[in-house]
């Protein structure tokens, strides 16, 4: 760009150019006037760029600090004042038309930052009107009138050519001053509620000044003088089309392009969220805290926040470096050593929404049991298969974990090599509860989308194999093996601590507050599955978690009574005579399962292991308490009556069995089978 020949000298900027800054102090305006004067000298002489850039960073940080005092108006005024500053830079660059204009980073990037602030203000203002109605927030009438004029000006700037973007600067800042005066008057007269103020603050998130400084620093240090050197996205174009708007003769589009795409800026609520009332649950707290400190608790839930790393710190912040070591020591003292690198869960140290999960447990040196899986805690399948998620097992002799594994839904692992083997089940094509043979948890839900794992675990006290310091539910269990979710000091886990599960506090608290219907504390940990990441650690040895799984299968046709008796006697005979294949499988616990054979769909099939016979009997007894009580009374009356002969007793019991009524000869399993058949035929 060649300088103008008819211009003998370039006049310096006049003091009235800085009068349009809204809400700024006199000292800041004087500092800004000196900044624009230095900018004028840099464009003419092409020197002094380093001093100017350092002063530019100081002015931007001072503007951000001054705008924080206005609370609800902080983001709105900061964005508008930055728009005014970049507008001045662009106007003086075009006015002087200096040969070395683009050597200055502020002159080179003035047009781009002006576009950025204009589109950002337009999107925020458009969402101010749309989300206000959807969130049932009625803003004051006078304030909405001024904001509507503000939106009209922004739409014209975004629709028109970007060459005339810097025009009308004073008129634009006059509308901003009207909004500032109206809002201040309403707040002084208590005509605007805290919820309305918080909504205005949420609608206009402040711009990250540190991001602007980082971009300018990169352009300055790398000596970029052409925008083609920057890694920028491809320019979006819209194809002209014939519509009703073309009848007016205007070659432009009525809707700005920024409103047609997803403009997900930092701190701005996602474009597909219309109701913002969940973000305004505590308006007083929102007004009393910093914007990004409050909105960070909604990270990933409608808002995207990232912490900018300062690449340049001005000289005004250099003396504060001596205080940094002391601040780091204080942060290390207040950190939670048991939660950052815990044995079972790693808790985030910063969580403004929920706090740290360590508050739900004992002190840092104590252990906390989140879930315990003993052999007496039966996993009952409800509306799908039952699965055991990633667990960590702890032994009695050592506090370090010995195994990390994932148990499939229908697979039953043996507690030790001396337990009774179980009859291998055959899979059918029509079986609703299919067995996931692969141990990979990620592939299981994809192949079986209907098999949602819902788990109910019952807390237990310390026993021979697990010795925690705190348990959720006190009960006496001896001689059992199990696995538990553990939280303890970092030295409890050897090896790498980089990949340790993270659990949400709100999710954990909601799980711990659930109560079962049978009187005992039942904790549904199925909701913890989405937020639990498996511990990546080598297993020293395999520790089994014995479980009892009940498979329910509908009966299509009634079967005679001898078949039912044979059905329940067969698992007991199979358990007493283990097969050579099961013995070989016990010796090699890590062997892959054999392919299952196909069989036809049969009647009700209730199979369990011999060692879990008492557990299943107790579960079924709780399902039918009245019938069980009647059987006990009949059994007591039968013992007192002492029948004359067994033949007479059989003659009396025979008709009752033939009539279909419950008698004392039916055990709890036959009673359960009878009830299922009755409900099926009904």
Curated annotation (Swiss-Prot):
Keywords: Activator, DNA-binding, Early protein, Transcription, Transcription regulation. Coiled coil: none annotated. InterPro entries: Herpes_TAF50 (IPR004998). One of its GO terms (biological process) is regulation of DNA-templated transcription. Residues 396-413, 452-470, 654-665 have a biased composition (Polar residues). Residues 420-434 have a biased composition (Basic residues). It holds the Pfam family Herpes_TAF50. Belongs to the herpesviridae TAF50 family. Transcription activation. This is Putative transcription activator BRLF1 homolog. It comes from Equine herpesvirus 2 (strain 86/87).
């Amino acid at each position: 760009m060649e300088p103008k020949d008819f211009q003998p000298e370039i006049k310096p900027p006049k003091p009235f150019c800085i009068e349009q800054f809204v809400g700024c102090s006199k000292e800041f305006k004087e500092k800004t006037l000196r900044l624009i004067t230095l900018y004028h000298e840099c464009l003419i002489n092409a020197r002094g760029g380093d001093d100017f850039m350092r002063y530019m960073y100081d002015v931007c940080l001072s503007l951000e600090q001054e705008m924080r005092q206005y609370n609800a108006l902080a983001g709105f005024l900061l964005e508008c004042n930055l728009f005014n500053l970049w507008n001045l830079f662009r106007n003086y660059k075009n006015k002087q038309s200096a040969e070395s204009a683009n050597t200055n980073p502020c002159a080179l990037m003035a047009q781009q930052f002006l576009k950025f602030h204009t589109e950002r203000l337009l999107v925020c203002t458009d969402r101010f009107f749309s989300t206000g109605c959807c969130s049932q927030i009625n803003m004051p009438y006078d304030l909405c009138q001024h904001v509507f004029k503000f939106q009209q000006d922004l739409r014209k700037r975004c629709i028109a050519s970007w060459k005339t973007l810097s025009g009308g600067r004073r008129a634009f800042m006059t509308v901003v001053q009207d909004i500032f005066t109206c809002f201040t008057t309403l707040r002084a007269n208590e005509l605007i509620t805290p919820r309305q103020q918080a909504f205005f603050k949420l609608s206009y998130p402040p711009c990250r000044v540190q991001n602007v400084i980082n971009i300018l620093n990169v352009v300055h240090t790398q000596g970029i003088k052409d925008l083609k050197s920057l890694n920028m996205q491809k320019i979006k174009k819209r194809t002209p089309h014939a519509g009703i708007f073309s009848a007016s003769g205007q070659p432009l589009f009525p809707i700005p392009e920024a409103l047609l795409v997803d403009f997900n800026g930092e701190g701005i609520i996602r474009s597909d969220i219309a109701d913002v009332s969940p973000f305004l649950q505590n308006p007083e707290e929102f007004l009393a805290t910093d914007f990004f400190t409050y909105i960070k608790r909604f990270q990933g839930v409608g808002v995207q926040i990232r912490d900018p790393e300062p690449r340049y710190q001005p000289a005004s912040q250099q003396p504060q470096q001596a205080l940094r070591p002391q601040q780091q020591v204080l942060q290390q003292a207040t950190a939670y050593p048991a939660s950052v690198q815990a044995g079972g869960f790693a808790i985030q140290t910063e969580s403004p929404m929920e706090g740290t999960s360590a508050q739900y447990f004992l002190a840092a040196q104590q252990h906390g049991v989140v879930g315990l899986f003993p052999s007496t805690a039966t996993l009952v399948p409800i509306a799908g298969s039952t699965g055991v998620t990633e667990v960590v097992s702890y032994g009695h002799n050592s506090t370090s974990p010995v195994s990390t594994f994932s148990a499939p839904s229908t697979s039953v692992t043996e507690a030790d090599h001396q337990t009774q083997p179980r009859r291998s089940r055959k899979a059918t094509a029509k079986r609703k509860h299919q067995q996931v043979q692969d141990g990979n948890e990620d592939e299981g839900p994809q192949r079986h989308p209907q098999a949602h794992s819902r788990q109910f675990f019952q807390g237990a006290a310390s026993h021979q194999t697990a010795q925690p310091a705190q348990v959720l539910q006190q009960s006496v269990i001896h001689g059992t093996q199990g696995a538990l979710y553990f939280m303890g000091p970092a030295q409890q886990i050897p090896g790498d601590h980089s990949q340790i599960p993270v659990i949400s506090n709100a999710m954990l608290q909601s799980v711990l507050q659930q109560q079962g219907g049978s009187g005992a504390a039942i904790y549904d940990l199925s909701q913890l599955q989405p937020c639990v990441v498996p511990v990546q650690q080598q297993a020293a040895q395999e520790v089994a978690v014995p479980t009892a799984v009940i498979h329910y299968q509908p009966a299509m046709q009634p079967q005679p009574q001898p078949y039912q008796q044979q059905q329940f006697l067969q698992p007991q005979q199979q358990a007493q005579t283990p097969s050579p294949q099961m013995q070989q499988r016990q010796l090699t616990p890590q062997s892959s399962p054999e392919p299952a054979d196909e069989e036809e769909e049969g009647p009700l099939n209730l199979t369990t292991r011999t060692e879990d016979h008492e557990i299943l009997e107790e579960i079924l007894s709780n399902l039918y308490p009245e019938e069980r009580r009647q059987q006990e009374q009949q059994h007591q009356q039968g013992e007192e009556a002492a029948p004359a002969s067994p033949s007479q007793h059989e003659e009396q019991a025979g008709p009752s069995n033939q009539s279909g009524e419950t008698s004392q000869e039916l055990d709890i399993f036959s009673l359960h089978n009878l009830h299922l058949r009755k409900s099926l035929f009904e």
